[in-house]
């Protein structure tokens, strides 16, 4: 046993020795590493322990010293340098820390702390104190102040578990394992505060700014210097220090005007609490403590002139002269009384103690003492009666408490609102008092108002604490988040050559090629020089560039996303990152934040990929270093190629999206979104259109790095949202896209070197990177000259803008974020592709094909025309659009071929608005492959160059992304081909099929119908083909660079592809084999089906990715197999068609549920239900038919009756009904039908009926009085006897009867039945008429409505004008319009004379029927002899003037039968008295009397306008007799035609009595 023990001891010693040796080696290695440049970190990691990165403090301090200057010499041995050290007092307190650069840090200093992520700036804090953490032995115990070497920092900053300490402690005293820590108090940058909080602050500041001067924060530089102080303290390594800064405090934003943005200077005004996520001043926190209390001097009142003391009106509540001892005794007595009372109430001694110890009890006792004049005896006697004041909770009922809590939840601590809405019986002060009581109760814990906005802060922190760490809330990432600092250049400096390789680098911001070192940094993780990076780290923004320099020749155009630090992307993004930034500090491990700090889960995969440099997202040093170190040529190439791989997946993905229409549109936004480096894209980005040429390349995103380095020319493909978990794919896409791609549209900053107006064609370098540039001699180069003003050198990156996908920011929602720049965000291809604001005067050359070859990269750049935004935000093509047809049609015909998958835009519209308004520079690609589902028909190339004349609007592709998604498209037939000059023509494929585009006169008509289009001449292969024309891998989607879209033959099956966005053109999907893979290049293209746009919801779910198929030739013809291919418990899949290795889930497989399965039952039920519904519908249909048949029969019967009556009666009163009724609101009785609804007299709008459109159509209709509405012939004078005719004529001659007729017919049918029934009843002998009451309040419907419905109205040709015809007194304006609109609809097919004749005949019939007095009386069962009796009766009473006048309301007109005004036989025919008579509502106006046929001339038709001379008494009697008959006839007519029960309420008893009396009189013998 002892031997074993000895062996074990020996082994342990050996292990210890080995450990010591390794330690020494590591120390040496660290010292040698000190000479290396600082390594930047590309990790996404959250809060990881600093110590895990195993960096020594020396290294950290060395690498980033006070000013963060990194050492520049690589691998050169240096003389040993000074080490960092610290000073201690004799008490052991560390007073200062001195770095190797002699920067001295002391407690109280404000400093930068390394954030360890290249895309986040340094953290800023103030040092509270230093402490040394080591094992039991102290580093230095000397009693005198001493300088000590600080320990190495490989132990946790504040969070390593204890066992590390014990391991580390084995070293000697002062061992490197000891470490120097510091407690720091954080300042938060504006970008680290949650966006919502900061936005509220900005809003408040602007609202409160009444000074008339701009706030200091309008200057972006100063805005970025504002910090928010916090009380949160963390412990960090001294090694994380990166320099000192100065922080000033200002009392408010106005005082901050004095701040000068000097180097390393910041200011703060407010505090920020990361726990509650609130700013101190904005949300009303309670501030207690000396720092928040005002220091008030003692009051020194002015002597008042009138001798009153200033305190006269104040209430004295306490006099301080009481003896303390007496006071204490009194209070004890009071409390003991309260305790006794409490014990009695509660039943336990605890209750008594609680009652005694309450503040309320003490307060009550003191108040009572004061009120008792400081007589303790009296006070105690009073207290006996009420020793304990009523508790606050007892003053509130349960219901009030509930309402209070509800109010708190609803309105927060807005007590005024709570009182107003819920507790009006309480005072606001009571609410506040109760709140402070309530908030301490247990139920308050779940109801506190602010918790709604809080996250559980405690659990956010992942730090484990060591015993030495103070228990304070960490709010920054534990210092050890620093982790691996691998950088692009980490290992490359190991060799001497690496120094030379550095010369190939250039800063992507300032373009300098000289720098101490190169690291990725900035919000976009681009390659930066030391100065730019340090500036970003300190101030959170890249430095402004005062004198832009040209990018070095070897860079195409730098992938520069940051224009100036101020206006670049990040300036808009910084706030977006706020939420997650603050969490960074608090160590919360949210998702790794994206470069802009966002942490939404969606971002997660892009997050890593969102950087723009090849290595940005790779965590391992290998990836990153390998890429950036490549020679510049390779580098450029990589940039071009990196996006390729990720595209592959998308490409196929789209192919699998069979719901091409909506889906494509939904994808669109997605692709776009990713094309912003940090856009939160959905997990699967699906690019809808780009196909990269490198099909054979590996599609695994992990291979992209290698592929990028490969030398084969690769093309940048539009960035498809490939969201593979390995994010490097995207990152590369974005970052590596040749700068050309990044051609910043107005929003993405363009290389500052590019003067805005000049196209910046990057000079193609010797490297293969000039991927898309066809050799100048190549056939395509010949096309370029066609474009006027286009730079002749083909633009290297002929990138087609990935149509909508590139509308980088098509507003996802109808409220598009405004684009900061004047130009449409897209313009990717602008002639200069790089012009930041390409004014669109230079037409981008049509990039032609390169020599055909498997990778002819030049394949199809379609032109994008940038331009200043047009009224719609569409960039006008200033020069292009207006290019005369003569100028190279191709040039002005921007994109006919590039059909974007409609889907993309649709998606955009449904995506929630993204938080980053900045579109990343659109990536463009030479080949954009339209998604397989929406092939673009190919046209022969020669035609492709025809310039359609009406394409003069900017191409839809360059459409401004700001446009909200277009409303659902109506069927194409309704699209007009005439576009206002400023609007885009609809995407070509959307033109109404019936109109061949004028642009291609040469196009043979049969072209579009033929299935085999002649293949385009080899010299201009259609740009859409990805490879040589004969075998394009995806030929089914060729694009034609500029051909007019084929007119789709009507014979093709119409497929529906909704074009979903301004930028998308719907392409008819090819059907059959062509869609699934047939090569069109070979010459066959599927007949283009008519494009029908299906209006579908835009929110189809996205299809999952499908693996990219290998590039291939057309699939074999399908063979029918019908074999089961897969079975599950409930269903079986059958393979219907076999296409070899290619298959289409939609057409080749079908799915059969097994009998008895739930699915089968569901389907059976659905079929049953459908059958039942169909039967029900059929039954209803049959019933409706029967009803219609009956109605037709009734109508025929009625017409026969009317004819018989017309023959029987005389036609003497021909135009009776066209004579006006008495005027006045009461006289115009409602017609027998309810007034027709207002129906447009304009051709109906065929399309979705919406209230808004309906309202607009009403507004658009000419007014009734408008001369344009005068539809009747002008030579036809209006009948002077009918004041309404003026209003009625326009409706009378309207010739679009369809809608109105249908409605009128239906209503007539319904009402005719009712009328008929009543009429039959009335015609029965012995039926006693009880006419419905006349409605005195009804607004007098048009007396001619009857004729309006029967399309007949006599228009006497001879009548002269009447002064009152145009403004009838009894008609309100709405009624006039209604009458005009409801006018009779004459059948359009009748000629004008026929129409007049028909009107006249019909009027005669109706008049003869309705004006026959006998017929009328019979209708009411009033016999003729009674009629006679009534006349005699009237004669008998002729002279009883006085009694007759008693009931009349006013004098009688001389021409009116005096009896008509009198009570007895008013003959209108209503009983006497003040009956509210609708026929005589007011005494008629004189003019009306003269105009009325009864009181005017006997034959107004023959003697227009003449008033007869005074008549003799006999004549007068005769006239009265006639009038009586006439009036009775009129009344009867009114009753018959207009008195309808459903229009009026109950009967007027007076009418009823009158008619029954009339009938009884008729039954008497005369």
Swiss-Prot record:
SUPFAM superfamilies with a match to the protein in the record: Glucocorticoid receptor-like (DNA-binding domain), Homeodomain-like
Domain BAH: 103-283
Record GO cellular component, one term: nucleoplasm
Protein's UniProt name: Arginine-glutamic acid dipeptide repeats protein
Annotated positions of the Phosphotyrosine modification: 1259
Record remark: domains: The interaction with ATN1 is mediated by the coiled coil domain.
Domain ELM2: 284-387
GATA-type ZnF: 507-532
